[in-house]
Amino acid sequence: SQHFRELFKRYVGVSPKKYLTTLKIQRSKCLLLHKEYSVTDVAYHLGFSSPQQFSKAFRKTIGLSPLLWRRAYMLQDESALSEKY
């Protein structure tokens, strides 16, 4: 197990845990674009043990909470649409 982690980090550049967390956070950004999914829904869907754990990982990776990221993205999207039309 330790050998696998060392090899993985050597070839990928990050630990397996960090790699999987990054994948989950990237996927969560897609799910957060759907207003029908709450942050709690997204957290459990991606296998986080709690919404708090998800929010902490998201904030550490992205720099914003999932809810603030969603709001900022939606505002940016609305702004782009209003400029276009």
Protein language model features and the residues they cover:
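Terminal helix-turn-helix DNA-binding modules in bacterial transcription factors
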Residues: 9-52, 71-85
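Short hydrophobic/aromatic patch on the recognition helix
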Residues: 4, 8, 53-54, 58
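Walker A (P-loop) phosphate-binding loop of ABC-type ATPase nucleotide-binding domains
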Residues: 1
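C-terminal interaction modules of eukaryotic adaptor/scaffold proteins
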Residues: 59, 70
